[in-house]
Regions:
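Carbohydrate-active catalytic/glycan-binding domains of CAZyme proteins
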Residues: 1-139
């Protein structure tokens, strides 16, 4: 895949277009590829997803992307993570955010519940529960 969507290549940090941090999940016979776009130092570092019927593709980017972005979760540099299933049976995405609005590193960790709603085409429309972002505290 290439950076073809406007959200995947914003000019807020000088770098070549970047796509990285892939995770693949298989739900109900469909493969879901979660990926990050933009350089991690870019305030618009974000997470989107694509789907395919095979782990080898071809991958189709979902029009609902990005699902994690500073405009959705309220913190800059929100990207590069992984999906996991919690003890409650729900799916979550763990990812990085910038230290503050003016500092990138050291980055902080966030966890957000995923909301999966199957469409008429059999593909899940994935969003996040932005009201319940988990912010681990370190002493």
């Amino acid at each position: 895949m290439d950076c073809t969507e406007p959200w995947e290549k914003t000019p807020n940090y000088k770098s070549a277009p970047v796509m990285e941090g892939p995770t693949v999940m298989k739900w109900d016979g469909v493969y879901y590829l979660f990926y990050s776009a933009n350089h991690f130092m870019n305030i618009d570092y974000s997470v989107g997803y694509a789907t395919a019927s095979s782990p080898f593709g071809p991958w189709k980017k979902h029009p609902n992307s990005p699902i994690i972005h500073r405009s959705l979760v309220g913190e800059n540099g929100s990207g590069h993570g992984d999906v996991f299933k919690g003890l409650d049976g729900k799916y979550y995405y763990v990812y990085h955010v910038h230290r503050s609005d003016s500092t990138v590193s050291p980055r902080k960790t966030r966890i957000v519940p995923l909301i999966l709603k199957k469409g008429n085409d059999g593909i899940y429309n994935i969003t996040v529960d932005k009201e319940h972002v988990i912010k681990p505290m370190w002493k």
